């Protein structure tokens, strides 16, 4: 009996000791876990990205159009800025980099980035650079500098750089981290090739733990001839100036375009659009005011591929081909060699007895012309007569749009698929288009819809 009581007492004591040990082990594990979490939190790694040098862009003769170079830049490590030293760094930056305005300096210190690029210190000597890094919140890193060697020349071809928008983030997700992306021209079209991979600067707390070097972008070689491009640009500027001198009007000529193709390869060797801009102004950022001025002027529009304008009399080539292939000639003619007498206007009657008169650009007319000479002299009357015959013979049938079909077979109405962004499709007007516009854009069409006069305008490229 005594032995049993003694055994129970011993068992109870052992049980209490075991529970105490178990409780201590639990506390120890919990404390270790919390300590580990604190340690992990303190050791959270953050990454800052610096863009690698973008690929360079060359013309057909290996002239460098756009270059990239690495130059030392001063950065501010904001994790080392606190209430005690902020004013010291603000004053230092204001005193040593007087070109930076107060607004810019405020933006630097209010940034949410780990590192903020302050200024290019390429022209600062080595000793002064060393004095900069003696201040613990300053860091020096090589940063790529983009230079557009010909300023405004070929700006619509090479394009410019800027901060990525939400749309850019979807199109070029890899360009978000270095926070720079091609916004137009070749810079945008070949963004994935030109950008390369950024350098990664990995932070542990407020110190740099590791640097993973990036990969430079790929070079781009174009068909452009920069010498011809320069001549074409200067010629267009002179032409605009001459037009404004000759024609006194409030609406000054400001826009123009030139495209030169190599007839052997169809490569673009010159493409000029005015007004233009200097891509160098975007390298370090452009003010909203200056950006708005360029935008209002139409400088960002690449007119050769985005301007939707009537082609003019060059469209008569389409009508020429149609006449040759379909044997459609002015009323009374049955071959290309037969002639009409162009007196400077075309007159024809409507069913109600009224008359319509179309006047040629040459008031006294072109005289006797056949298909070939009418194209050579750009005789409107001859081609109006062809359009009138098409309308009278085929109005309301599928053949009514035979001219448009020939135009589309030659590429009118579609994009050229040139390797530049934002190209607009052309427009070949016909009855179907007018009917669609009547629903979606009624302000663009008359209530009576597509008429023979529209076909007559189209055949001379208007």
PLM region descriptions:
Residues 1-286, 399-409:
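Periplasmic/cell-envelope proteins involved in peptidoglycan metabolism and beta-lactam response
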């Amino acid at each position: 009996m005594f032995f049993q009581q003694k055994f129970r007492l011993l068992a109870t004591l052992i049980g209490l000791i075991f529970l105490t040990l178990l409780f201590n082990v639990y506390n120890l594990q919990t404390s270790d876990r919390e300590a580990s979490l604190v340690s992990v939190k303190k050791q959270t790694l953050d990454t800052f990205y610096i863009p690698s040098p973008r690929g360079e862009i060359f013309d057909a003769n290996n002239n460098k159009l756009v270059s990239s170079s690495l130059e030392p830049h001063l950065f501010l490590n904001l994790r080392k800025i606190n209430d005690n030293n902020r004013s010291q760094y603000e004053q230092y930056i204001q005193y040593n980099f007087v070109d930076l305005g107060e607004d810019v300096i405020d933006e630097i210190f209010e940034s949410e980035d780990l590192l903020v690029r302050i200024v290019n210190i390429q022209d600062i000597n080595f000793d002064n650079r060393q004095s900069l890094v003696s201040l613990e919140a300053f860091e020096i890193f090589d940063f790529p500098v983009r230079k557009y060697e010909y300023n405004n020349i070929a700006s619509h071809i090479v394009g410019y750089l800027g901060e990525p928008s939400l749309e850019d983030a979807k199109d070029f997700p890899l360009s978000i981290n270095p926070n720079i992306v091609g916004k137009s021209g070749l810079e945008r079209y070949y963004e994935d090739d030109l950008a390369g991979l950024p350098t990664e600067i990995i932070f542990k707390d407020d110190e740099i733990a590791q640097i993973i070097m990036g990969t430079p972008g790929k070079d781009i070689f174009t068909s452009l001839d920069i010498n011809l491009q320069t001549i074409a640009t200067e010629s267009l500027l002179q032409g605009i100036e001459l037009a404004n001198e000759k024609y006194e009007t409030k609406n000054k000529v400001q826009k123009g375009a030139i495209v030169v193709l190599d007839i052997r390869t169809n490569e673009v060797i010159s493409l000029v659009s005015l007004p233009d801009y200097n891509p160098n102004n975007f390298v370090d950022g452009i003010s909203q005011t200056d950006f708005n001025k360029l935008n209002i002027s139409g400088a960002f529009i690449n007119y050769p591929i985005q301007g939707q304008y009537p082609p003019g009399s060059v469209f008569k080539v389409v009508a020429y081909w149609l006449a040759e292939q379909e044997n459609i000639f002015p009323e009374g003619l049955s071959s290309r060699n037969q002639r009409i007498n162009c007196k400077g206007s075309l007159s024809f009657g409507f069913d109600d007895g009224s008359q319509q008169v179309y006047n040629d650009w040459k008031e006294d007319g072109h005289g006797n012309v056949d298909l070939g000479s009418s194209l050579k002299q750009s005789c409107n009357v001859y081609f109006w007569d062809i359009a009138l015959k098409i309308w009278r013979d085929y109005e309301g049938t599928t053949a009514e749009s035979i001219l448009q079909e020939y135009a589309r077979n030659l590429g009118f109405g579609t994009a050229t698929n040139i390797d530049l962004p934002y190209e607009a499709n052309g427009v070949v007007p016909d009855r179907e288009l007018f009917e669609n516009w009547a629903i979606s854009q009624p302000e663009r069409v008359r209530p009576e819809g597509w008429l023979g006069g529209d076909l007559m305008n189209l055949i001379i490229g208007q």
